[in-house]
Amino acid sequence: MSDKKTFEENLQELETIVSRLETGDVALEDAIAEFQKGMLISKELQRTLKEAEETLVKVMQADGTEVEMDT
């Protein structure tokens, strides 16, 4: 079983972090740690979206060759 979180799990965790930080009830040290964790999750989400976009841009023709579509 893989320990890698799904896109949806990462998004939920990022939303939770943002909510905690928005309350303002977090100690400064904890807020910095949460912010850093959120930034890492955000980068992972962006990477996943980029990979998905690259996959969707390719379309297989009937003969099996790939065609790049305009984005």
Curated annotation (Swiss-Prot):
GO BP term, pick one: DNA catabolic process
Species per Swiss-Prot/TrEMBL record: Streptococcus agalactiae serotype V (strain ATCC BAA-611 / 2603 V/R)
Gene Ontology CC entries for this record: cytosol; exodeoxyribonuclease VII complex
UniProt KW keywords: Cytoplasm, Exonuclease, Hydrolase, Nuclease
Protein name per Swiss-Prot or TrEMBL: Exodeoxyribonuclease 7 small subunit
Molecular function in Gene Ontology: exodeoxyribonuclease VII activity
Signal sequence segment: none
Coiled coil regions in record: none
Quaternary structure, from the entry: Heterooligomer composed of large and small subunits.
Encoding gene, per UniProt annotation: xseB
Name of a matching Pfam family: Exonuc_VII_S
Family, as annotated: Belongs to the XseB family.
Superkingdom of the source species: Bacteria
InterPro entries the UniProt entry points to: Exonuc_VII_S (IPR003761), Exonuc_VII_ssu_sf (IPR037004)
